[in-house]
Each structure stands twice: as C-alpha cells, then as structure tokens.
C-alpha cells in the first residue's frame, strides 16, 4: 500500500523545498462560481518515498475568476495533484477505478488558514499563502472515476472516499490570517 501525505508548511517559502523534495509550480483549470473555468497556479513540493508527501504552498488566482480560497478548492487541488502524479508516473502502480479503493490512500494535510499576500506585479492575479499554526488533516482512500470527468479538462477525476478528519478550522476571524480552508469533521 502506498500512502500519500500532503502537508503545508506554515511559515517557510516553498520556493526552497525541504531536503529530498522536488518543487512544482503547476497551472490547474478549476470551476469558478457561476459557471465556466478559471486557471490558477499552485506551488507545492513532493517527496517520493514509501509515503508520498506533498506540501501545498502558495495559490495564485486571477481576480476576474471570483474564486474564493476555501475547503472545496483545497480538496480539488489535492485531487488534481494526485492525478498529475499518476500522469507523470510518480506513483508506482495504478489507482483503482471507483468504487474500489484498495491499495492507495492519501494523508492530506495543509494549513487551515490562508491569507492574501499580494498581487503579482503587472497582473490582476492575487497570491494567497498558508499562515497561522493550525493544520487541517484528512486520511482518505483513493480511486479514479473515469465516469465523472473533470468539468474543466475532461480528464478522469480522483475521488477521495471513506475519509477520516482531524485538525481544526481556522481559529482567526480577524486580521489578515483568517481565510478558512478546513472543513471540520
């Protein structure tokens, strides 16, 4: 069984990944509120070992998308990262078609708070970064759902199943570090 561990660094820049990790900046097409799709950019680090670890960092979203940083966006980012890893051949084996979930699981953790940290100069793209001390963690089985294509790319979607949750929603409701990305259990 291969386990996936997705975690977010709280205070360090992911441009310098921890030792043994590989840095990725990838664009992803995601549904936006009210219909249509929006291209966002996600920074993350990957360590390929018996447990595959991913640290999600900054998220760059064009302001015209009207797309909030939210628990559902983090969920979609995690699924897209796992799908990209299967396409790249990072994952040794095949994720089973749904509803079967044997063999692969994900440990998906990330900062439960994000904050707006600026606009990329010369663009309308906003950058959001993890902040604060709390983490959101869920452990799920994985399967690929070829009958449920991604609404923006048409690719098969990864589904999370039988999830157990730990971690806390963002505790802050004031100040800049207050965007909640964690769904409470």
Positions of predicted regions on the chain:
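Bacterial N-terminal signal peptides
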Residues: 1-3
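Surface-exposed charge patches in extracellular/virion surface proteins
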Residues: 10, 26, 32, 47, ...
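Structured domain cores in non-transmembrane regions
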Residues: 48-104
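Short N-terminal edge-element motif at the start of the domain
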Residues: 9-62
């Amino acid at each position: 069984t291969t386990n996936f561990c997705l975690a977010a660094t709280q205070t360090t820049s992911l441009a310098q990944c921890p030792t043994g990790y590989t840095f990725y900046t990838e664009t992803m097409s995601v549904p936006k509120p009210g219909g249509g799709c929006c291209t966002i950019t996600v920074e993350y680090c990957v360590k390929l070992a018996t447990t595959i670890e991913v640290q999600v960092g900054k998220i760059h979203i064009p302001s015209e998308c009207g797309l909030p940083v939210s628990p559902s966006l983090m969920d979609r980012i995690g699924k897209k990262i796992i799908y990209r890893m299967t396409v790249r051949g990072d994952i040794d084996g095949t994720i089973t078609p749904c509803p079967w979930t044997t063999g692969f699981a994900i440990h998906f953790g990330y900062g439960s708070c994000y904050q707006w940290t600026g606009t990329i100069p010369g663009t309308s793209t906003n950058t959001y970064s993890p902040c604060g001390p709390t983490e959101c963690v869920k452990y799920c089985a994985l399967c690929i759902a070829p009958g449920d294509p991604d609404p923006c790319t048409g690719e098969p979607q990864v589904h999370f199943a039988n999830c157990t949750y730990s971690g806390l929603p963002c505790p802050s409701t004031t100040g800049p570090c207050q965007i909640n990305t964690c769904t409470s259990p």
